[in-house]
Amino acid sequence: MMTERRAKLKAKGTLRASQLMRFPTAVKRDAAIEIWMHDHPDELGAIARRWFEVMRNCGDDVRELLHDGHPTACVADAAFAYVNAFTAHVNVGFFRGAEIADPDRLLEGTGKFMRHVKIRCDSHVDAAALTKLIEVAYIDMKRRLKAE
């Protein structure tokens, strides 16, 4: 259903297409993610599981799916974060990371929208700061959805 504001913008020709990554097939719990987690039993998998669980716990409206081969967390159908395990590190990534506050300067990357935090087994990550970053990304996506 189109809101009155969106209807006015559309009538003026100023309504822009959404720049959000939308996944209408996202579900509360995706069996494919459980398989992915099972297939990553090592230390990097444990790191990925820990941070994906933080994403899952952001709110009742969090949905998930396996996108591009890695677990992705959404607010409803709009992706806000993901995890991915590589050979020597895990990325905790943010779909609109370039636009969220990062006071602890954890984010890496130079893309137009996306940023990530790289976690290696032998390095320390500020857990409180990363948890806050995930929460900020979740709240930011909720705000973006409400504004559409």
What do the PLM-derived regions correspond to, one by one?
Residues 1-148:
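Charge-dense, helix-prone N-terminal extensions
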